[in-house]
């Protein structure tokens, strides 16, 4: 958490969207791999 906070503070606007995109991709990949099936279903 501390690391994410520092990164966000360092570049607010380039890291935030990137993190959100990664989160979205990870969430989409998770159900495909068998991680989070609730949101996908």
Curated annotation (Swiss-Prot):
Annotated region (Disordered) at: 1-41
Q: Please provide, in alphabetical order, the Gene Ontology terms of the cellular component aspect for this entry.
A: nucleosome; nucleus
State the source organism's domain of life. Answer: Eukaryota
Q: Which UniProt keywords apply?
A: Chromosome, DNA-binding, Nucleosome core, Nucleus
Cystine links in this protein are none
Where it sits in the cell: the answer is: Nucleus; Chromosome
GO terms (molecular function) for this protein are: DNA binding; protein heterodimerization activity; structural constituent of chromatin
Q: How does it assemble?
A: The nucleosome is a histone octamer containing two molecules each of H2A, H2B, H3 and H4 assembled in one H3-H4 heterotetramer and two H2A-H2B heterodimers. The octamer wraps approximately 147 bp of DNA.
Recorded family membership: Belongs to the histone H3 family.
What does the UniProt record say this protein does?
Core component of nucleosome. Nucleosomes wrap and compact DNA into chromatin, limiting DNA accessibility to the cellular machineries which require DNA as a template. Histones thereby play a central role in transcription regulation, DNA repair, DNA replication and chromosomal stability. DNA accessibility is regulated via a complex set of post-translational modifications of histones, also called histone code, and nucleosome remodeling.
From the Swiss-Prot or TrEMBL record, give the protein name: Histone H3.2
The upper taxonomy is:
Eukaryota, Sar, Alveolata, Ciliophora, Intramacronucleata
